[in-house]
Amino acid sequence: MAERRVPFSLLRGPSWDPFRDWYPAHSRLFDQAFGLPRLPEEWSQWLSHSGWPGYVRALPAAAIEGPAYNRALSRQLSSGVSEIQQTADRWRVSLDVNHFAPEELTVKTKDGVVEITGKHEERQDEHGYISRCFTRKYTLPPGVDPTLVSSSLSPEGTLTVEAPLPKSATQSAEITIPVTFQARAQLGGPEAGKSEQPENK
């Protein structure tokens, strides 16, 4: 099976901005965007000329430059991405769960489906209180033994769930049949090979 990526993200797109006269003095309050980085400059310029005045505010240069923005954008683009791989002998799913501790993650199998759940209770951050939860389900390939499914969490926050594929699915269906050699059978039984002798009188 070919590699398949399943990204998801949230798009910011307010159709109007009642606080544009208040910006940028209080921009920090309204531009938190719940952890999402601002739109890249070229998107902002395109949207501001799209015929929808006020659709997107002009962004200050500081908002789109610098390592902090690059790190935030990199994290957002890499967050929440699920990657499924299937090799000749293994099936594997990798999922970015960097916001969750190991004890906040649950991996279980039921009816040929792997279910990954993450949840942490409400906690305080620099902007207030936040809670997160998610559930992802993946169908196991036919014949996979659910008791052999294993999972591991990397220090970078990548959860890997994998299982060996059954032998019947990984081995070729081609079977070599040995050829045995037999001498040609003699017709008429063992006595047929004897030449008949004329009877002497």
From Swiss-Prot:
Compartments where located: Cytoplasm; Nucleus; Cytoplasm, Cytoskeleton, Spindle
Main location per the UniProt record: cytoplasm
Processing and modification events after translation: Phosphorylated upon exposure to protein kinase C activators and heat shock. Phosphorylation by MAPKAPK2 and MAPKAPK3 in response to stress dissociates HSPB1 from large small heat-shock protein (sHsps) oligomers and impairs its chaperone activity and ability to protect against oxidative stress effectively. Phosphorylation by MAPKAPK5 in response to PKA stimulation induces F-actin rearrangement.
Record-listed Phosphothreonine modification sites: 170
Record-linked CDD domains: ACD_HspB1_like (cd06475)
Entries under Pfam families matching the protein: HSP20 (PF00011)
Alphabetized InterPro entries for the sequence: A-crystallin/Hsp20_dom, ACD_HspB1, Alpha-crystallin/sHSP_animal, HSP20-like_chaperone
Cytoplasm is among the record's keywords: yes
Modified residues (Phosphoserine): 15, 27, 74, 78-79, 82, 94, 172, 195
Region Interaction with TGFB1I1: start-end pairs: 68-201
Domain annotation sHSP: ranges: 72-180
Example of a GO cellular component annotation carried by this entry: cornified envelope
Modification type N6-acetyllysine: residues: 119
Modified positions (Omega-N-methylarginine) in chain numbering: 12
SUPFAM superfamilies associated with the record: HSP20-like chaperones (SSF49764)
UniProt KW keywords: Acetylation, Chaperone, Cytoplasm, Cytoskeleton, Methylation, Nucleus, Phosphoprotein, Stress response
Biological processes per GO annotation: anterograde axonal protein transport; cellular response to vascular endothelial growth factor stimulus; chaperone-mediated protein folding; intracellular signal transduction; negative regulation of apoptotic process; negative regulation of oxidative stress-induced intrinsic apoptotic signaling pathway; negative regulation of protein kinase C signaling; positive regulation of angiogenesis
Any one GO MF annotation of this record: unfolded protein binding
PANTHER family: HEAT SHOCK PROTEIN BETA-1, HEAT SHOCK PROTEIN HSP-12.2-RELATED
Assigned protein family: Belongs to the small heat shock protein (HSP20) family.
Subunit structure as annotated in this protein's UniProt entry: Homooligomer. Homodimer; becomes monomeric upon activation. Heterooligomer; with HSPB6. Associates with alpha- and beta-tubulin. Interacts with TGFB1I1. Interacts with CRYAB. Interacts with HSPB8. Interacts with HSPBAP1.
Function: Small heat shock protein which functions as a molecular chaperone probably maintaining denatured proteins in a folding-competent state. Plays a role in stress resistance and actin organization. Through its molecular chaperone activity may regulate numerous biological processes including the phosphorylation and the axonal transport of neurofilament proteins.
Protein known as: Heat shock protein beta-1
Gene: HSPB1
